[in-house]
Amino acid sequence: MGMIDKLFCPKCGHQPASQTVFQCTDCRGILEVHVNFGQLTAADFQRMRQSRDQSIWRWFDFFPLAQRSSIVSLGEGNTPLLPATRLGEKLGIANLYVKNDTVLPTGSLKDRSNSVGLSVAREWGFKTAAVMSTGNAAASVAAYSAAAGINSVVMVPAGTAASKIIQARAYGATVVVIDGSFDYEVAKLYKAAVQEFGWYDCLSSNPYRDEGKKSYAYEMADQFDGESPDWVIHPTAGGTGIYAMWKGYKEFLSLGWIQRTPKLVAAQSEAAAPIVAAFERGVPDIEAVIARETVAESIQVGNPASLGWRALAALRESGGTAIAVSDSEILEAQALTGSLAGVFVEPAAATSVAAAKKLRDTGVIGRGDIIVCNLTGHGLKQPEAIRLTDKEFTPIAPTLDMLRQQIARFEIM
């Protein structure tokens, strides 16, 4: 089983006495969980691959949970790794794959994190879970809290897509819309509320929660039959996905279950790209920026707080990079992903495809490289991003002549 070996601060090395503390009492850094997965063998890899449980929990040994009875699962994980041949041809990439997390229970990658996070909350006996979110985490925490029998409170900034708020409400969450910026006013109130009311904190500062995102690496190792792609491109806000994925790859590498690791790429919106800025400057820490408005609202985070440095370290250790893309590039990538790969993604998810195009155009990645773009959220999370005109839906007379005129515009005859 996956037993917690230690909880420690990766910055100063301090190990707190309690496993329920999330922040280092010495340097205020975010703590990290080390799971003792024992002396696993290649036979164990095959056993896990062949498990009837195809959720992330077939990798139970790698997660910080003592008892299987504590698991809170909605069937998350083992999402399709699809060859995107037509999309690849358009981008000039011969071996392009998309990892389709739009099919996860609440439609986003956050389900990987919150299945683990809420399982820990159940094991510890918490009654209420809380999160502040630009939308996707709100819905996911609400769903997994409902499955766990735990109350949920979610705080979102004003302007969050109504579809995401409605989804969280549908799962029974108490949704509070805050007038203010996500990185500052919302964050300040959230931190005070968690301390005041003793709620279980489901933010990325929770070192248990994002252990779930290690499953990206586990699944790709399985789906590539023990091999690794050359590059994995991931839409990035605070960087926990990059960090956790790299941690998962290193765990499998240490066991000999894979022979090499991929280069990781953090894809950010130009309107909120503190990780890209720090990577390009060659500095070890993140400097917060004021996030501007962007169509990629799920990754509109200008202040990764004390977490971003781990993503930077992972990018550099993997030999990868970080890249920012514009809203126009994101919307173009969203349209291409739908029309050429058959996957409807929200704008934030499309940043991985936009980044792949930009990296190919600049020669950073080669035509023959094996590329995976993580598609992290469903397009129905933010349907208003599809900019249609009323003219496209103007009714026509029910005649073949009118139909010919209508469809001729779309070049399908």
What kind of feature is each model-predicted range?
Residues 1-413:
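PLP-dependent amino-acid enzyme catalytic core
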